[in-house]
Amino acid sequence: MSAGRITAKKLALAGMLTAVAAALSVLERFLPLQAVVPLPGVKLGLANVVTMFALFFLDFRLSAAIVLARCLLGALLGGGPTGLMFSLTGSMLALLVMAALKRGHGRAFSLFGISVAGAAAHNLGQVLVAMALLNDAAVLAYLPALLAAGLITGVLTAAAALPFFGKFSKTGVAGK
């Protein structure tokens, strides 16, 4: 079996993870987070639990496909084209950063460090989209507040993911 081959098990897992990520994205829209954190655009990043999970138990290609499908489904289910630009840019940048840091997992970066860096990358991606849409660099002034929120949400996301990592790695479902 070649290393790049996608098995039926992995494809089925990717499909399930896509459904879970899309459901979490939609669910997150209904959480009244703005009542607790009065910063526009701040979300918990629940779907990033799935992204990290896919990175660790599948591969980069399938993880990217899951992120792309989640963003497209989110746009179709109410996010619209502007929401797609924000979501896709932030999510893909987060995926790239987390994939790069995953190589140092256990040595240089913990799951928490990878998650926080992913949250920061996601926020940076969204600010870059806002700058492009508004044609105004003043949007960068919002980045420190988003990065502070990303620190908190990144830690929460990693804490939510951690119990699943240990249990799932013992099943052998992903072939690792």
Question: How would you label these PLM feature ranges?
Answer:
Residues 14-16, 23, 66, 87-121:
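Short helix-perturbing small/polar motifs within transmembrane alpha-helices
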Residues 6-17, 44, 48, 63, ...:
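Residue-level signature of transmembrane alpha-helical entry/exit and packing/kink sites
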Residues 2-53:
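Hydrophobic transmembrane alpha-helices
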Residues 58-68:
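Transmembrane-helix signature of polytopic, membrane-embedded enzymes
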Residues 44-60, 97-102:
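Generic transmembrane alpha-helix motif of multi-pass integral membrane proteins
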Residues 25-44, 69-98, 111, 134-138, ...:
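Interfacial aromatic-anchored transmembrane helix boundaries in multi-pass membrane proteins
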Residues 21-26, 52, 75, 91, ...:
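Transmembrane alpha-helical segments of multi-pass membrane transport proteins and ion-pumping complexes
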Residues 38-40, 80, 84-85, 104-176:
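Membrane-embedded alpha-helical hairpins and interfacial helices in multi-pass inner-membrane proteins
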